């Protein structure tokens, strides 16, 4: 794979997506994300304030953190307002406090955290009521009654408001924390203290066996975006990338396929693992995906939100780390796709030469195309969404499970950090590792870098999914709703 430098000439523009484009629509998007947050934290104080796993924060930390983030960007950055509560920023700075340290902080009690969220939201909605179009091209708005923000360049405010970017950033941020809350529920459910919340368990479509792979011919395609108003800085700019011919599986790896890897001794065969992966496997005594266990009679169970159930063989495997995915791929004589291969298989339309916003086109996700937004607390069976297939015939690229790729998280040619370095840029460069949960030194460097994940999971909101969306995490992560699919060279 090669990127054509920083030159974006020749890039086929992707049409502007159907993202909410008015203050009223942005307000509804904010309210929708808040409904999920409040549903996942509708608990007594004890389970809200307890740390259910050193991998995660107490739920009450996430609850107030999303309010603080909203205050920072939708009140202070846009209007120049002062802090709603003194000292609030220091308490909820994710970079300052490792997750293991957060239970000891003087966090807002649940009732005060909810009151803080309501206070911030009320002020934000009042500000939204004052928005009016700016006299410049594009979807630009600003508070009509607010003077220039002290210390904030007018150009930056305009850019934050272009296409409602800053509102989309806050909406997506809250939905991402909602997915983190669900992962905490899954981890905490082992003690019987948490449930998945009040979401309705919708019936998911039946699967259909469409095993096999598709061939993606060599050639350039447009990777990333320069037009999606809600895209993060790490998705920008759109640029041309040449990808050699490759083959990629039509569907993610199933529980059935990964069980075959387990029962063939894959977790005990050092030859299949990278040195770092084998060291991690031995340290953590990995023998199967997280939440799998033997049933005592030769079968397997999966623990899902407080209950054990027979392992569903035809669902995508989830709760595997990057090292497990890599070892499985080697066992199968395959490899993980690169990030560029994944996006080309997902978005490129060879008939038009342009990239789509989603595998099926530019229309937003529907229940017929993808399993998103916590419709159910599990992935759908493989082959359940033929209507969501890409132009190459690859299915279930959006929703169900995040997918590990082979690629390190890195900047695109021409990357420019916006609106703050700590969202993307600080994660591009490998740095001295420390366990983000405990803050302990990491001499084996398992926490040194980040691998790219693509596609979204059953718990991801549709606003935080698109063909260009990039997620990233340490290669040891298993508690997230992540799986993988396999690829290989064409020759």
What kind of feature is each model-predicted range?
Residues 2-57, 61-68, 73-86, 90-123, ...:
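Disulfide-stabilized, aromatic/cysteine-rich ligand-recognition loop
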Residues 54, 158-166, 199-208:
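Membrane-interfacial loop-to-helix junctions in multi-pass inner-membrane proteins
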Residues 126-132:
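Polar, glycosylation-prone regions of secreted, cell-surface, and some intracellular proteins
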Residues 170, 174-176, 180, 186-204, ...:
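Functional-site microenvironments in short loops/helix caps that host divalent-cation chemistry
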């Amino acid at each position: 794979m090669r990127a054509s430098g920083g030159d974006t000439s020749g890039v086929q523009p992707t049409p502007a997506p159907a993202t909410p484009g008015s203050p009223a629509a942005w307000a509804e998007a904010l309210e929708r994300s808040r409904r999920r947050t409040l549903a996942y934290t509708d608990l007594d104080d004890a389970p809200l304030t307890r740390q259910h796993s050193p991998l995660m924060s107490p739920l009450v930390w996430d609850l107030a953190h999303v309010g603080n983030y909203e205050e920072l960007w939708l009140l202070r950055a846009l209007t120049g307002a002062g802090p709603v509560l003194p000292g609030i920023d220091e308490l909820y700075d994710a970079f300052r406090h490792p997750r293991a340290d957060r239970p000891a902080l003087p966090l807002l009690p649940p009732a005060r955290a909810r009151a803080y969220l309501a206070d911030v939201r009320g002020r934000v909605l009042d500000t939204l009521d004052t928005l009016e179009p700016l006299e410049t091209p594009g979807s630009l708005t600003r508070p009509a009654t607010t003077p220039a923000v002290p210390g904030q360049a007018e150009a930056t405010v305009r850019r934050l408001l272009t296409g409602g970017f800053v509102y989309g950033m806050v909406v997506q941020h809250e939905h991402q924390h909602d997915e983190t809350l669900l992962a905490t529920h899954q981890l905490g459910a082992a003690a019987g203290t948490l449930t998945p919340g009040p979401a309705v368990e919708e019936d998911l479509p039946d699967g259909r066996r469409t095993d096999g792979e598709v061939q993606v011919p060599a050639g350039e395609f447009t990777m990333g975006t320069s037009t999606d108003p809600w895209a993060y800085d790490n998705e920008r700019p759109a640029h041309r990338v040449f990808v050699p011919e490759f083959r990629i599986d039509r569907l993610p790896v199933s529980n059935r396929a990964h069980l075959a890897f387990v029962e063939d001794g894959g977790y005990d065969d050092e030859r299949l693992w990278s040195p770092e992966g084998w060291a991690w496997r031995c340290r953590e005594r990995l023998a199967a995906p997280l939440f799998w266990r033997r049933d005592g009679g030769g079968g397997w169970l999966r623990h899902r939100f407080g209950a054990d159930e027979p392992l569903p063989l035809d669902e995508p495997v989830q709760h595997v780390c990057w090292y497990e995915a890599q070892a499985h791929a080697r066992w199968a004589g395959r490899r993980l796709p690169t990030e560029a291969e994944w996006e080309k298989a997902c978005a490129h339309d060879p008939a038009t030469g342009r990239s789509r916003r989603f595998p099926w086109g530019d229309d937003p996700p529907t229940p017929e195309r993808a399993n998103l937004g916590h419709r159910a607390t599990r992935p759908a069976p493989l082959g359940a969404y033929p209507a969501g297939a890409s132009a190459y015939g690859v299915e279930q690229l959006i929703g169900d499970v995040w997918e590990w790729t082979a690629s390190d998280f890195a900047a695109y040619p021409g990357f420019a950090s916006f609106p703050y370095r700590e969202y993307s840029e600080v994660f591009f460069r490998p740095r001295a590792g420390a366990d983000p949960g405990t803050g302990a030194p990491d001499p084996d460097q398992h926490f040194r870098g980040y691998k790219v994940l693509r596609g979204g999971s059953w718990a991801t909101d549709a606003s935080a999914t698109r063909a260009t969306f990039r997620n990233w995490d340490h290669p040891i992560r298993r508690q997230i709703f992540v799986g993988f699919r396999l690829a290989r060279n064409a020759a």
